[in-house]
């Protein structure tokens, strides 16, 4: 399978499916150089996060030096050292990152307030939801204390999943329990403005995570900043149990992608046999892999390995069922 994909690329043929998730790639494609293999940007970002320090192509194992966003023809240098600070990194790849600019700094005289300028530059950062990890303009809620940000819909979904009452935490940060406030976003300028440089899921990243967490892709979002409001106090003890459940669910979600990769390995191992025997086509392989893997995700109930599941046995049974349906 890998040799087939490699030769396909070598002949100059575009890939129609991501070799990590086996889904189509109509957009959001990243190409590794020099090997030329293509993946969903989100998939290759997660792959590199799971294999920290390893920049090898998942298909051919060639060391990648550049990742190209094919939608925008943006090239990202993957060899930038991890010891560079955040602004050094921006200087290194700034010319490649679409139109990222700092806020205008204007004064009525020729004197420059260096302290004010430094404070202004420190606001150039990026936004990521503390629950789902996505970075987009739909993030609408933030915490003034720890600076985590969320989609309002993600907060609601978490409460539903743990059977918590809406008043028990709908409007509070799941990390520090502070009451959340609206995050005002405008598209007037192409600036990302946050207030923290720590490295944490759902927070600002100053070190080099892959593509600096796709900062160039989201460079059209301006966060005007978080209003200096004093959140009202609340009784943490009343919702302590809910927060415990929410934190458990958050940790489970962080492991979910890794677990899915492991579960898919069971499915692909069996499917590879049928594919090499020419019993399933490439399209059928992709369809069956996705459907059977999703069934195993559901059966696992967020835990891998589930002690009561024979993954290989169940995968084989489900695969044969799907093959029979496709042949009828």
Curated annotation (Swiss-Prot):
Keyword terms of this UniProt record: Cytoplasm, Metal-binding, Nucleus, Repeat, Zinc, Zinc-finger
Gene3D superfamilies the record matches: Zinc/RING finger domain, C3HC4 (zinc finger)
ZnF (RING-type) intervals: 18-61, 129-177
Compartmental location: Cytoplasm; Nucleus
Entry annotated with the keyword Repeat: yes
PROSITE patterns: ZF_RING_2 (PS50089)
Molecular-function annotations in GO: ubiquitin protein ligase activity; zinc ion binding
Record-level GO BP terms: ubiquitin-dependent protein catabolic process
GO annotations of cellular component type: cytoplasm; nucleus
Main location: cytoplasm
PANTHER family assigned: ALCOHOL-SENSITIVE RING FINGER PROTEIN 1, RING-H2 FINGER PROTEIN ATL61-RELATED-RELATED
Job of this protein: Required for tolerance to alcohol.
Protein name: Alcohol-sensitive RING finger protein 1
Organism for this UniProt entry: Eremothecium gossypii (strain ATCC 10895 / CBS 109.51 / FGSC 9923 / NRRL Y-1056) (Yeast)
């Amino acid at each position: 399978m890998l040799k087939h994909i490699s030769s396909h690329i070598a002949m100059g043929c575009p890939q129609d499916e991501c070799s990590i998730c086996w889904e189509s790639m109509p957009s959001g494609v990243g190409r590794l150089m020099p090997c030329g293999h293509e993946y969903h940007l989100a998939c290759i970002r997660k792959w590199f996060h799971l294999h920290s320090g390893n920049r090898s192509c998942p298909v051919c194992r060639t060391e990648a030096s550049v990742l190209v966003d094919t939608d925008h023809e943006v090239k990202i240098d993957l060899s930038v050292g991890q010891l560079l600070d955040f602004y050094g990194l921006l200087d290194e790849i700034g010319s490649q990152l679409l139109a990222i600019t700092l806020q205008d700094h204007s004064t009525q005289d020729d004197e420059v307030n260096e302290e004010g300028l430094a404070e202004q530059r420190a606001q150039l950062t990026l936004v990521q939801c503390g629950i789902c990890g996505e970075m987009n303009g739909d993030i609408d809620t933030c915490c003034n204390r720890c600076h985590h940000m969320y989609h309002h819909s993600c907060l609601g979904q978490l409460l539903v999943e743990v059977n918590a009452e809406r008043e028990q935490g709908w409007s509070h940060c799941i990390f520090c329990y502070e009451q959340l406030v609206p995050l005002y976003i405008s598209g007037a300028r192409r600036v990302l403005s946050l207030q923290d440089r720590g490295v944490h899921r759902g927070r600002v990243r100053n070190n080099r995570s892959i593509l600096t967490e796709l900062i160039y892709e989201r460079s059209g979002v301006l966060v005007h900043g978080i209003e200096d409001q004093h959140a009202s106090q609340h009784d943490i003890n009343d919702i302590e149990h809910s927060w415990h459940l929410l934190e458990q669910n958050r940790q489970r979600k962080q492991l979910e992608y890794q677990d899915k990769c492991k579960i898919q390995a069971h499915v692909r191992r069996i499917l590879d046999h049928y594919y090499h025997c020419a019993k399933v086509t490439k399209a059928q392989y992709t369809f069956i892999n996705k459907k059977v893997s999703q069934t195993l995700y559901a059966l696992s109930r967020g835990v891998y390995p589930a002690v009561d599941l024979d993954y290989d046995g169940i995968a084989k049974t489900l695969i044969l069922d799907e093959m029979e349906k496709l042949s009828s």
